[in-house]
UniProtKB/Swiss-Prot annotation:
Pfam families: bCoV_S1_N, bCoV_S1_RBD, CoV_S1_C, CoV_S2, CoV_S2_C. It comes from Human coronavirus HKU1 (isolate N1). Residues 1005-1055 are annotated as: Heptad repeat 1. Isolate N1 belongs to genotype A. CDD domains: HKU1-CoV-like_Spike_SD1-2_S1-S2_S2 (cd22380), HKU1_N1_CoV_Spike_S1_RBD (cd21483), MHV-like_Spike_S1_NTD (cd21625). The lineage of its organism: Viruses, Riboviria, Orthornavirae, Pisuviricota, Pisoniviricetes. Belongs to the betacoronaviruses spike protein family. Residues 924-944 are annotated as: Fusion peptide 2. This is Spike glycoprotein. Residues 905-926 are annotated as: Fusion peptide 1. Specific enzymatic cleavages in vivo yield mature proteins. The precursor is processed into S1 and S2 by host cell furin or another cellular protease to yield the mature S1 and S2 proteins. Additionally, a second cleavage leads to the release of a fusion peptide after viral attachment to host cell receptor. The cytoplasmic Cys-rich domain is palmitoylated. Spike glycoprotein is digested within host endosomes.
Length: 1356
């Protein structure tokens, strides 16, 4: 629980801050509080209290609460004065820390004045800062009652009370409030005014204050409890001033004895009336630890292992890096230029010192609290670095800063990391000096025109919604598209290079053509379809700023009056932000988050509790504080060269510090743990003390922590022995207090050891002796079997076997939306389901517990595996998870851009360009005529309705040819005039082609218009007929309704209908029936859900059992060798390996399994000489060759019986217990006949139908004649059918246009160059020659092996 601390460290605490009076105040010295000679004796319940709401009878319990330490002393904090008050009375040690609480013993001063009894004692005040913004608890005697208040007092600087019996020259003054203070608690309690002592028990826990009281030394009883929600840090006993009190009168002496409380475990004993009669502080002594361990005030004789003992430190070693600069955190926090939450600022402080007390005082702190860290531990601690974030707080959003809040400040501005160790500071600055820096950190907002907010200096901007965009986002539409829009034209502008224009599309809606619709409408916050909006809502993460405000894209384009054509947005286009002032009471409220990195592992240190660097003590146990890391250890100086200049601490693999380099002396040290050992206590019921054995510790180490009186001590083979005489040369054959390794603690009564005490100056009732148990030479005729002889088989030979085992330790998590599972989206079902109470909540709670249990189980399994287990990666198992051969195409389908695509010939697409044109019937005939030869253009002129036509498309070569002909005809007239005829014909025929195409389209349009007009006329006639028919229907229906109304009136009058409306009755019945059916469905589905959850619980129980079994097998089989047979595999365990598997662990066990056995006679025990019994230890007594021998239980190996393999018994008798013969009841309960039971319950139930008669003649039954209207509608349908439009078919023809001549020329040249290069490679290079040589050799005749012939010539 986070407790907000409104105080400075304890060194700054004072009693009040209001100067109520200056009369008779001095600073004369006074004595320190007295220390009591008597101590807290809890043996009869002193210092204990009764547990709330619980009663215990005749029992002993262990209870952990807030108790004083047994044997602790009291301090007397009472102060008594006459006229003067000393300023030293209001400082330490009288002003004390409250911590967990206090137990006080108060003397009740009883005075008789004028035959009136006055009960007087001092007033105690418990609080924190003792001013009117925190609660102070005051316990004050007043006129024979206890007046207890918890109010926001303004305490005086020098508070005091006065005597009521004899009065005082001073006026009582301990608080000053102009008006009635705010109080949480105010109540009077009676107490026994005639008692001598009063006892008070005050403690606090989790923000709640508890008070207990008693008027005797018995346990205190509950007085009251009060939740404050904050810590009380100090307490103080007010001085009591009286007139002329006699100092020699004991009855007039003030005493207020106080001792602190701490959280301790007590053993409490209750009698048959529920009264605490005895108590034991479990950690006060070794004997009390035995009492608590056995829950007995008188433990049995025995040896008890107690909590470990560690040698206590004898010195302190303190180290800090010297001469580090001050962090100056307060200067950064007090900077008057404060950011807003939108652009919060961060600064990192490292390698410096800071004083938290001074810091909190300099920044006008409102509150300071920490998360995942105790704020009180910051004082004196060191950190690797401290990261500070700050921003001004909008007054209306202050609640958003609560940890875990999802308000605007944490969702869209600054996210507080609740998983890290951090502290939250709320402070303020004078508003007159503060200027809020409202800066938008979003780069994409600023790119499109966001400049500033134009707000006042105290207005704090914060984001309500954040939006993220990709790098190609642009909010403006493309200008060319916008110009084509005739309706809903979007604003447009030029977007930056590398960005995409706003997504828009043009459609036809009703009679509006080119109606444009763009994305992100009406704005990104309330977009119709968020998926089509490029602006995505986002939440800020830890350490992140808001990605940007949303932009209304309808307000982005070329701004009015601007010559800039780039995409910009107007000021009001940016959405999702708001602002508020930070000023209250003329101060601006600011929030700062302290993130603590590397706690106790750095050089950024708080110097609040700064201590000077000390000497490094070696070879002794010391407390150390090394650069903020604290602990205990023994330093040994070593020569180490592995420290770099920036390193000074040495760690092991587990993160424990094991060495350090001293920056002061430049020496290096290794750190070893302080000497520690286990403590064994030997206790005998007749003794008043214990014999202690500090195992593996020398007495010289132990004596550093223990003050000896008359106890003897010595070093033994087992360790240091206290309170026993060293008599190891003396042996005993029987021992009740065995210490192990052949040693025993023998108890002697004081009478038997009196002679020995005369010879030794220091002696004890215990002796440390050698233990030699009875060892008999076994004679066959003196030994008898105990319990009979039995024949068993013992293994004599084995073989190694391996076995795989899979154990499930985890399971997939299941979550169910109960309401949706039962009712889907049916509203009526949800309403009825709400009447089932918390069923769904219970289901979700159970599943959450199941999932939490899964997490916990998995964590435990992981912890077990992480501690000393190596997961084998070479197990040859039968579990294969090869997914390479799994074909998912049948599930996924075709993926990629080529799915569903079709194409023409590759060469056609490569060599030609495609053109599509409308064909009314002559284009296809023209192409069939030309056959691809463009020179036949005019020869293939087509005739359409007697008109010469050509297709309106020309290729590049045709255009070139006709242009050349026209040019030649124009250059040399009249001789070349004939050359222009083809051009003229070409133009005229193609114009004819366009004309006939338009003619056909025009005719089609006329046909459509005529047919549509006819259809409208038919529809009109049909609607008229329908209207007439509906009028007739309405007339008949109205008349029937009138008749029905008359019938219902008769029913109401004659039969006394329960409702005036039959429809209402039917609707209610239907609704009731529907609810019944819904209820049945809900019951069925809830039953199914309950069965499923029950199955989940059953399954998780199996998983939990499997996880527990897996952890047990990891610990017993993998980490060690199990003694259990068939637990780790099949047989006697050798070793096991473990491997991760899906939802579990896979074990490979190796064991040896017996394959041959020997049958022997065994006995459960042997009786020696008729009175001493022995039993085998981890084996059997076997009769081998008429001799009794011992053999192990897992392997036949006879050996002599000795004290190492037997257990001794005091008797030879055997106690038998007969097993009860109890069987499970498997009988099926017998039920009575169903029909007879039904008749028993319903034998008198009879339903009689009422005699109902109706006057049907009063109903007006009218028949409708709609023959004429039906014929008229039929004629309209026929007319619509005749409106079929036989439009002229206009085909679409696809033609190919050849490339120009120069393209073919370029292709030819490229082909020729390729052939030349190929020829050069094949014929003019060595590669080509080698190829020809190969081909030549292929044709040679092969006739077998040919020897090489070498021809040589020489002179004889």
């Amino acid at each position: 629980m986070l407790l907000i601390i409104f105080i400075l460290p304890t060194t700054l605490a004072v009693i009040g801050d209001f100067n109520c009076t200056n009369f008779a105040i001095n600073d004369l010295n006074t004595t320190v509080p007295r220390i009591s000679e008597y101590v807290v004796d809890v043996s009869y319940g002193l210092g204990t209290y009764y547990i709330l709401d619980r009663v215990y009878l005749n029992t002993t319990i262990l209870f952990t609460g807030y108790f004083p330490k047994s044997g602790a002393n009291f301090r007397d904090l009472s102060l008594k004065g006459t006229t003067y008050l000393s300023t030293l009375w209001y400082q330490k040690p009288f002003l004390s820390d409250f911590n967990n609480g206090i137990f006080s013993r108060v003397k009740n001063t009883k005075l008789y004045v004028n035959k009136t009894l006055y009960s007087e004692f001092s007033t105690i005040v418990i609080g924190s800062v003792f001013i009117n913004n925190s609660y102070t608890i005051v316990v004050q005697p007043h006129n024979g009652v206890l007046e207890i208040t918890a109010c926001q007092y303004t305490m005086c600087e020098y508070p005091h009370t006065i005597c009521k019996s004899k009065g005082s020259s001073r006026n009582e003054s301990w608080h000053f409030d102009k008006s009635e203070p705010l109080c949480l608690f105010k109540k009077n309690f009676t107490y026994n005014v005639s008692t001598d002592w009063l006892y008070f028990h005050f403690y606090q826990e989790r923000g709640t204050f508890y008070a207990y009281y008693a008027d005797s030394g018995m346990p205190t009883t509950f007085l009251f409890s009060l939740y404050l929600g904050t810590l009380l840090s100090h307490y103080y006993v007010l001085p009591l001033t009286c007139n002329a009190i006699s100092s020699n009168t004991d009855n007039e002496t003030l005493q207020y004895w106080v001792t602190p409380l701490s959280k301790r475990q007590y053993l409490l004993k209750f009698d048959n009336r529920g009264v605490i009669t005895n108590a034991v502080d479990c950690s006060s002594s070794f004997f009390s630890e035995i009492q608590c361990k056995t829950k007995s005030l008188l433990p049995n004789t025995g040896v008890y292992d107690l909590s470990g003992f560690t040698v206590k430190p004898v010195a302190t070693v303190h180290r800090r890096i010297p001469d580090l600069p001050d962090c100056d955190i307060d200067k950064w926090l007090n900077n008057f230029n404060v950011p807003s939450p939108l652009n919060w600022e961060r600064k990192i402080f490292s390698n410096c010192n800071f004083n938290l007390s001074t810091l909190l005082r300099l920044v006008h702190t409102d509150s300071f609290s920490c998360n995942n860290f105790d704020e009180s531990k910051i004082y004196g601690s060191c950190f690797k670095s401290i990261v500070l974030d700050k921003f001004a707080i909008p007054n209306s959003r202050r609640s958003d800063l609560q940890l875990g809040s999802s308000g605007f400040l944490q969702s869209s501005n600054y996210k507080i990391d609740t998983t890290s160790s951090s502290c939250q500071l709320y402070y303020s600055l004078p508003a007159i000096n503060v200027t809020i820096n409202n800066y938008n950190p979003s780069s994409w907002n600023r790119r499109y025109g966001f400049n500033n907010f134009n707000l006042s200096s105290h207005s704090v901007v914060y984001s309500r919604y954040c939006f993220s965009v990709n790098n190609t986002f642009c909010p403006c539409a493309k200008p060319s598209f916008a110009s084509s829009c005739k309706s809903h034209k979007p604003p447009s502008a030029s977007c930056p290079i590398g960005t995409n224009y706003r997504s828009c599309e043009s459609t036809t809606v009703l009679d509006h053509t080119d109606w444009c619709r763009c994305s992100c409408l009406p704005d990104p916050i309330t977009a119709y379809d968020p998926r089509s909006c490029s602006q995505k809502k986002s939440l800020v993460g830890v350490g992140e700023h808001c990605a940007g405000f949303g932009v209304d894209e309808e307000k982005c384009g070329v701004l009015d009056g601007s010559y800039n054509v780039s995409c910009l947005c107007s000021t009001d286009a940016f959405l999702g932000w708001s602002y508020d002032t930070c000023v209250s009471n003329n101060r601006c409220n600011i929030f700062s988050n302290f993130i603590l990195n590397g706690i106790n592992s750095g050089t950024t240190c708080s110097n609040d509790l700064l201590q000077p660097n000390t000497e490094v003590f070696t070879d002794v146990c010391v407390d150390y504080d090394l650069y903020g890391i604290t602990g205990q250890g023994i330093f040994k100086e070593v020569s180490a060269v592995y420290y770099n200049s920036w390193q000074n601490l040495l760690y092991d693999s587990n993160g424990n510090i094991i060495g350090f380099k001293d920056f002061v002396t430049n020496k290096t040290y290794n750190i070893f743990p302080c000497y520690a050992g286990r403590v064994s206590a030997a206790f005998h019921q007749n003794a008043s003390s214990l014999a202690l054995l500090y195992r593996n510790l020398k007495c010289s180490y132990v004596l550093n922590n223990i003050s000896l009186t008359t106890q003897p001590y010595f070093d033994s083979y087992l360790g240091c022995v206290f309170n026993a005489d060293n008599l190891t040369d003396y042996s005993v054959s029987s021992c009740a207090l065995r210490m192990g390794s052949g040693f025993c603690v023998d108890y002697n009564s004081p009478s038997s050891s009196s002679s020995r005490r005369k010879r030794r100056s220091i002696s004890a009732s215990y002796r440390f002796v050698t233990f030699e148990p009875f060892n008999v030479s076994f004679v066959n005729d003196s030994i008898e079997s105990v319990g009979g002889l039995y024949e068993i088989k013992i293994p004599t030979n084995f073989t190694i076997v391996g076995q795989e085992e899979f154990i499930q330790t985890n399971s997939p998590k299941v979550t169910i939306d109960c309401s949706l599972f039962v009712c889907s989206n049916y509203a009526a079902c949800h309403d009825l389901l709400s009447e089932y109470g918390t069923f769904c909540d219970n289901i979700n709670s159970i599943l959450d517990e199941v999932n939490g249990l899964l997490d916990t189980t998995q964590l435990h399994v992981a912890d077990t595996l992480m501690q000393g287990v190596t997961l084998s990666s070479n197990l040859n198992t039968n579990l294969h998870f090869d997914v390479d051969n799994i074909n998912f195409k049948s599930l996924v389908g075709c993926l990629g851009p080529h799915c569903g695509s079709s194409s023409r010939s590759f060469f056609e697409d490569l060599l030609f360009d495609k053109v599509k044109l409308s064909d009314v019937g002559f284009v296809e005939a023209y192409n069939n005529c030309t056959g691809g030869s463009e020179i036949r253009d005019l020869l293939c002129v087509q005739s359409f309705n007697g008109i010469k036509v050509l297709p309106p498309i020309l290729s590049e070569s045709q255009i070139s040819g006709y242009t050349t002909a026209a040019t030649v005809a124009a250059m040399f007239p009249p001789w070349s005039a004939a050359a222009g005829i083809p051009f003229s014909l070409n133009v005229q025929y193609r114009i004819n082609g366009l004309g006939v195409t338009m003619d056909v389209l025009n005719k089609n349009q006329k046909l459509i218009a005529t047919a549509f007009n006819n259809a409208l006329l038919s529809i009109q006639n049909g609607f008229s007929a329908t209207n007439s028919a509906l009028a007739k229907i309405q007339s008949v229906v109205n008349s029937n309704a009138q008749a029905l109304n008359s019938l219902l009136q008769q029913l109401f009058n004659k039969f006394g209908a329960i409702s005036s409306s039959l429809q209402e009755i039917l609707s209610r019945l239907d609704a009731l029936e529907a609810q019944v059916q819904i209820d049945r469905l809900i019951n069925g589905r809830l039953t199914a859900l309950n069965a499923y959850v029950s199955q989940q619980l059953s399954d998780i129980s199996l998983v939990k059992f499997g996880a527990a079994l897996a952890m047990e097998k990891v610990n017993e089989c993998v980490k060690s060798q199990s003694p259990r047979i068939n637990f780790c595999g099949n047989g006697n365990h050798i070793l096991s390996l473990v491997q991760n598997a899906p939802y579990g662990l896979l074990f490979m066990h190796f064991s040896y399994k017996p394959i041959s056995f020997k049958t022997v006679l065994v006995s459960p025990g042997l009786c020696i000489s008729g009175d001493v019994g022995i039993a085998p230890k981890q084996g059997y007594f076997i009769k081998h060759n008429d001799h009794w021998m011992f053999t192990g239980s897992s392997y036949y190996y006879p050996e002599p019986i000795s004290d190492k393999n037997v257990v001794f018994m005091n008797t030879c008798s055997v106690n038998f217990t007969k097993a009860p013969l109890v069987y499970l009841n498997h009988s099926v309960p017998k039920l009575s006949d169903f029909e007879s039971e039904l008749s028993h319950w319903f034998k008198n139930q009879t339903s009689i139908a009422p005699n109902l008669t109706l006057n049907l003649h009063t109903i007006n039954a009218t028949f409708l004649d709609l023959y004429y209207e039906m014929n008229l509608i039929q004629e309209s349908i026929k007319s619509l059918n005749n409106s079929y439009i036989n439009l002229k078919d206009i085909g679409t023809y696809e033609m190919y246009v050849k490339w120009p001549w120069y393209v073919w020329l370029l292709i030819s040249f490229s082909f020729i160059i390729f052939l030349v290069l190929l020829f050069f490679i094949c014929c003019c290079t060595g590669c080509g020659s080698a190829c020809f040589s190969k081909c030549h050799n292929c044709c040679d005749e092969y006739g077998g092996h040919h020897d090489f012939v070498i021809k040589t010539s020489h002179d004889d």
